Design a protein with these regions (language model features):
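Hydrophobic, aromatic-enriched alpha-helical segments typical of multi-pass transmembrane helices
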Residues: 1-200, 205
Length: 206
């Protein structure tokens, strides 16, 4: 496996795997006892959530400029609005609860959830476009991976990374993206092998 190919596998699989691992430890409820860990956990994963947007874009790079832009814009919307959820309902709410102002958390939870929903819907749309493009291009080979990433994106909408459904959703994303990238890479290798290569004739001495 080439280094570039290995890097792309890591790019599509590592962010959801990290979120799944962290999700196992995520408190189900925000309380005074869990507030400090809740806050610190969301600070730690602040740069991880936006990385989920790379996988659907990577899968459509070879499907045309228009699809690349559509998925790119949807990924940007996801990253912007879901980060707001992480900051407000994660870092902000955890900080308020830790400082004894738990009565104010309902406000930041409400704002965060509304903004995060916009981001999650944009993510579902990006995943749907990317998976649909793979099915159109690669037919049945892309169906298992497309189903996995679609399930993962839908679970992400409401379960986020909470255990168990949120963790399952992130694992579905990781496995599905790896499956789809394998299909894309295999098709690229076959296409390259079938492409005629010019043969250079050796110069004949006079």
């Amino acid at each position: 496996m080439h280094a570039r190919s290995a890097l792309l596998y890591v790019t599509v699989a590592l962010p959801p795997l990290v979120l799944a691992a962290i999700g196992v430890t995520h408190p189900i409820h925000l309380t005074s006892a869990s507030a400090e860990y809740w806050r610190n956990l969301h600070i730690a994963i602040l740069p991880i959530f936006p990385l989920l947007a790379f996988a659907p874009w990577i899968l459509v790079r070879g499907a045309g400029v228009v699809l690349g832009w559509v998925v790119g814009v949807l990924g940007f919307l996801y990253a912007a609005f879901y980060t707001a959820l992480d900051v407000l309902a994660g870092i902000g709410a955890g900080g308020l609860a830790y400082d004894g102002m738990g009565m104010a958390t309902s406000t930041v939870f409400g704002l965060g959830n509304h903004l995060g929903e916009v981001g999650s819907v944009a993510f579902i749309a990006a995943v749907a476009v990317s998976a649909g493009s793979c099915i159109v291009r690669f037919r049945t080979a892309a169906i298992p991976g497309s189903v996995l990433v679609s399930v993962g994106a839908i679970l992400f909408l409401n379960a986020h990374i909470y255990f168990p459904l949120g963790v399952v959703g992130q694992l579905c994303l990781a496995l599905g993206w790896v499956w789809l990238y394998f299909v894309v890479e295999r098709a690229a290798r076959v296409h390259s092998a079938l492409r005629p290569h010019p043969v250079e004739s050796a110069a004949q001495p006079r």
